[in-house]
A protein has these predicted regions:
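Short, solvent-exposed loop/linker segments at the N-terminal edge
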Residues: 227-233
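A short N-terminal beta->alpha junction/helix N-cap motif
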Residues: 37-41, 62
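Short glycine/threonine/proline-enriched tight-turn/helix- or strand-capping micro-motif at secondary-structure
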Residues: 33, 104-109
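Mature N-terminal segment immediately following signal peptide/propeptide cleavage
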Residues: 41-54, 77
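Accessory beta-strand-rich segments of carbohydrate-active enzymes
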Residues: 2-21, 28, 33-37, 51-55, ...
Length: 233
């Protein structure tokens, strides 16, 4: 069974694992009536209250929280989507030409801060509605800053960076009947943060919506547009 290795967060040659290919973004409906009402029986939005634990670095983060027998009922509650800095953890930071860790720690090119690099651990329990059961299930994170590792029912699913793109994973092999435990660990800075250094405020966390999608046997996944020119026009 594959396992998450924190060394991946620090490796500038590594930025994703088990992430589904990017594709066009649109909603899928099981019928015309669902389309008319805008309510799909093939989608479950996981936005809302999640359980949450904050740590100032990976060494301080709670080990084994993703396991099914780990009790996180005493953890804090946090809103998803939200930047953790807007929920009372860490503070927002504005940086222009400097890297956000400048002055805190001497970080070599391509590496990441070790002493202060906040880690956000999230847990969400869910049950699939009957309309989604028995179908392949994908999860899509529309925005997570800046890197995240994902587990379902204690099994490692995958890892990704790139804060402002949507990322999807196949949860089908890890699902169980009844209640499922989804665990996410978010890293404020990864080796990719060297490439995301621009003139903006720095935050971290699951800051856009999270969706579960049931995938029908026959479905449209991607679209493309190709323009053909006639003559010299």
């Amino acid at each position: 069974m594959a396992a998450f290795d924190f060394a991946k967060v620090k490796d500038p040659t590594f930025f994703k694992e088990n992430v589904l290919n990017a594709h066009a973004s649109f909603r899928t409906y099981a019928s015309r009536e669902e389309y008319r009402t805008g309510s799909s029986s093939l989608a479950l939005k996981l936005d809302g209250i999640w359980k949450f634990a904050y740590a100032k670095n990976y060494t301080s983060a709670i080990p084994g929280f993703e396991k099914t027998d780990y009790d996180c009922s005493g953890w804090d509650d946090i809103h998803v989507p939200a930047h953790i800095q807007m929920e009372g953890y860490d503070i927002p930071q504005y940086a222009n030409v400097q890297y956000p860790w400048d002055g805190r720690e001497d970080v070599k090119l391509g590496e990441i801060p070790q002493r202060f690099n906040p880690v956000a651990s999230y847990v969400k329990y869910f049950e699939l509605p009957e309309s989604m059961q028995g179908k392949p299930i994908h999860i899509e994170f529309e925005g997570v800053e800046s890197g995240m590792a994902l587990w379902l029912n204690g099994s490692y699913v995958g890892y990704t960076e790139d804060s402002f793109s949507a990322h999807a994973f196949d949860l089908t092999p890890y699902l169980q009947p009844g209640v499922n435990k989804l665990a996410v660990q978010v890293f404020k800075w990864t080796s990719s943060s060297w490439c995301e250094d621009q003139d903006f405020f720095r935050f971290s966390g699951i800051f856009r919506s999270v969706w579960l999608y049931a995938i029908p046997t026959v479905h449209l996944e991607d679209v493309s547009v190709k323009t053909l020119f006639a003559g010299d026009d």
